[in-house]
Amino acid sequence: GEERRPVFQSTARDFIEKAIESDRAFLAAYNPEVDKLAFEREWTARQSGARSEVHSFEPNYQGSSVAWGPPGSSCSAIGSHQFAARAGHHLAPLRLASGQDVFEQLGEGFTLIELGVPEGGAEDFAAAAKALNIPLKLVRDHHAESRDFYQARLVLVRPDQFVAWSSNEDTGDASSILTRAVGAGP
């Protein structure tokens, strides 16, 4: 409920209802029975307008209590498509240095993508996951292009392929990060 309900509400309000109101206003202003030429001209011009709606439709859970989104953010259907690994957003596709697609490497539980971190960073997560009995797969790719693409050195991916947490810095408290990501802590 915390994540998906607001996204469904946003989809209804910000896209479906908005499209219905836009169509209603258009048909009130341009009636083909009154002025067919004006209707056809505006109809043609209108066809290119949906692109912005397509680009802004990006369901995300950045306001979720189990994601490290920006303070004050909310779960919504409105967002922006980016390659950066952002908490609460779907992981972008990437061909790893091994030649495999990142999605082929994700585990059934959580996955930590390690893109070149100080020694021990990924191991801290592995040890914490084991102690907490949280399924965690480690994927390592030290290719600089991958790090630049995701704009992070560590990316914690949920089972639904959404990013729970990412960092370019210190790993932080791996146990607290995992506990929050599974909804068992603040």
What are these regions (language model features)?
Residues G1-P186:
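Helical substrate-recognition/capping region of FAD-dependent monooxygenase/halogenase enzymes
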